[in-house]
Amino acid sequence: MLEIRITDPRWTKKLKNLDALLQKALECCLEGKKAEFSVVLTDDEFIRTLNKSYRGRDTPTNVLSFNYTNEQIGIGIIGEVILSFDRLVIEALENEIKFEDHLLHMFIHGVLHVLGYDHSSDRETLAMEKKEEEILKKLALLG
């Protein structure tokens, strides 16, 4: 299950099928396992505040993810992914890719962090990128 909180109305103006899109991506990430996630669709200002508080970086970022235990947030919810509309629009334009594609990639990236993937070393980075590509290909086939 995916709980979606939207703090910036530009998200719903940009994408009409947001709920279904993210739910399908989460299902592909979980590979049949049951888990609850929360996603916050926000802006640069909010994500910058979180990035400063939790990572010591006073700058906006595209995605943040938080891994929770049951005691921290509630039974069943294992993680939260936070995405910045502003960052994703800028990065999609810079990389000449569709906003929807970049959103899916960054959402998957955040979910994989919650599931234990990381990119602290070259080996971890390769494993995470490979998993992201597998999920994106699967989504394209389901699309």
From Swiss-Prot:
Top-level taxon in the UniProt lineage: Bacteria
Entry binding sites for Zn(2+): 109, 113, 119
Alphabetized HAMAP family for the sequence: Endoribonucl_YbeY
Single GO MF descriptor: metalloendopeptidase activity
Cofactor note: Binds 1 zinc ion.
One Pfam short name: YbeY
Protein known as: Endoribonuclease YbeY
Keywords attached to this entry: Cytoplasm, Endonuclease, Hydrolase, Metal-binding, Nuclease, Ribosome biogenesis, rRNA processing, Zinc
EC category: hydrolase
Its biological purpose: Single strand-specific metallo-endoribonuclease involved in late-stage 70S ribosome quality control and in maturation of the 3' terminus of the 16S rRNA.
Lineage: Bacteria, Pseudomonadati, Pseudomonadota, Alphaproteobacteria, Rickettsiales
InterPro entries cross-referenced by the UniProt entry: MetalPrtase_cat_dom_sf_prd, YbeY
Keyword Iron: no
Subcellular location, principal: cytoplasm
GO aspect biological process, one term: rRNA processing
Compartmental location: Cytoplasm
Needed co-factor(s): Zn(2+)
Protein family according to the UniProt entry: Belongs to the endoribonuclease YbeY family.
